[in-house]
Amino acid sequence: MFRRRDTETAGGGAANPGPVALPAPRQPLLPTYPPRGYLGQLDPAFQSALSKRREGANLEDFVWYHATELPDGTVLPGVWDLRGHESTYLGGVDFAGKRVLELGPATGYLTFHMERMGAEVVSFEAGFDVSIDTLPVKGEDQPWERLRVMQETIDRNHDAWWYLHRTFGSSAKFVQGNIYDMPGDLGIFDITVVGAILLHLREPWGALSQAAQRTTETMVVTEPLQDDLDPPETNIMRFSPSAEHHLTNWWSIYPGAVDSMLGRCGFGKTETTMHSQRHHLAHDIGSDAIDQRMYTVVGHPVF
């Protein structure tokens, strides 16, 4: 059922919503999941090797997706500024003692926030086949140069994630793979967080269903509300690339569509929160930030 709760914009300093009451844990949809590619990434030796590989990166070369405050008080500006409004963005969910799968961590701001809230976090990012989720462009069979630039940006995001991992003394894990065919040895999670990535995926349903098969308690999905042509509860997902040469924005997805997809995944007890977050358009940190309208759908299993 679609239930809506409104909050003030992030700039208005509204109090965060309280925790969402959790039902009793359920058994996952697929209690045993066959292992597939990209196996072994949770092994401590592999994680250590990943960290060491990123140690030589220069701070000035990082791309900061989220504004982040370091322990010494230094603030690193980012495309999004969620500081002080993390709970709203994450639907008011209680992460204490939970194993969390985070899809699309970018530079890791929410990774380490959830860890500070008591979660064990596994951050999942696109693998080397990132081009499968790029939009085709008329007249270009293989837009290699733009793909190369996009992959470099993603790689610098990963450098930033590992920099913060070391800075905060984190125990979070970082894995890569195909979001439509996740590694089978990731295990089962209490909570999955899907943070503003469905609009970038050619198959949002495929990604949600993959995550739901590994989740027992809660699905948290946050997306931008990109237009208001229809009521939020409308079950609509529009093909809506933002510009002819933009590679990654596929869809304008309404809360009602996310609600319906979660229901089909077995998480039909939902609550939707409308909110706003500070955002620099076109990833231009030098531009004036806007209050980007967002929504978060929290889904629990229906027994």
Residue ranges and their predicted role:
Residues 91, 181-188:
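Short amphipathic alpha-helix with an adjacent loop that forms part of the alpha/beta core around
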Residues 1-57:
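Membrane-proximal basic amphipathic "stem/tether" segments
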Residues 98-106:
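Conserved class I S-adenosyl-L-methionine
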Residues 74-98:
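Conserved alpha-helix/loop element of class I SAM-dependent methyltransferases that forms part
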Residues 154, 180-184, 193, 202-210, ...:
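S-adenosyl-L-methionine-dependent methyltransferase catalytic module, highlighting the catalytic core
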Residues 109-181:
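Class I SAM-dependent methyltransferase SAM/SAH-binding core
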Residues 188-196:
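Short SAM/SAH-binding signature in class I
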Residues 101, 124-125, 222:
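The conserved SAM/SAH-binding core of class I Rossmann-like methyltransferase domains
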